[in-house]
Amino acid sequence: MEKLFIFKIGGKMLDHAEELEAFLKGFSSIQGRKILVHGGGIFADDLAKKLDIPITMHEGRRITSAPMRDLVTMVYGGLLNKQVVARLQALGCDAIGLSGADGAVLKAKRRKPEPIDYGLVGDIFEVRRDLLETFINHGMTPVLAPLSWEASGEILNSNADGVACKITEAFSGLYETYLFYCFDKPGVLLDVENPASLLAQLDRPAYESLKKQQLVKDGMLPKLDSCFRARTLGAHKVLLSTPTNSLKFAAGADYVGTLIH
């Protein structure tokens, strides 16, 4: 079965031009089929502060008001997405930038307001694999912003980790899917200040235990929830690590990071 590499990168990397450039060079050199999903929460927060738009989070998930939804649409679907696509094109990677509204590629329903009202947040229930597959078959690399589309015509904010998970799920019956969550740590750490506390592997019971001890919390919760969901739904490999280590693993090296079981 042919391999498909799905990378998710976050706002911290997007906020550091040199790190982003190094990653995009490595990503563009990957042979074969690949998809890139990006976040951008740091950019969104910075702009929200300048515009006096309140920022509200719950357990690492953004509560999205109408003004915040408009802001993330501009930031994620506009500036950040097109900057990444422009750099990939310059590096010889034929990329196409998409939000979930483009071709209704990420179909979602607004999350129910109980027990927490997350506002204009979409839970993705369908990925248009046929559309993404068309681009991939033409040698193009889809670059997706974490915005989804509701049938009413509403644009909804969706968690980028969840977007990567749903895309992996959609393709897992067609390809041997490799999902990489790239961030600024080498993986899941028992002590965030000590890289030597890296967990090389993590299964569901161990994760639940870490949650109870509050050794993982905040933004790591939705990330790890997405990791286990992707693994359950057919992902061949799911790795949390740095961009450099993730790229090396995609190129055939032994993994360094946290492999999800």
Residue ranges and their predicted role:
Residues 1-261:
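C-terminal catalytic "cap/lid" subdomain
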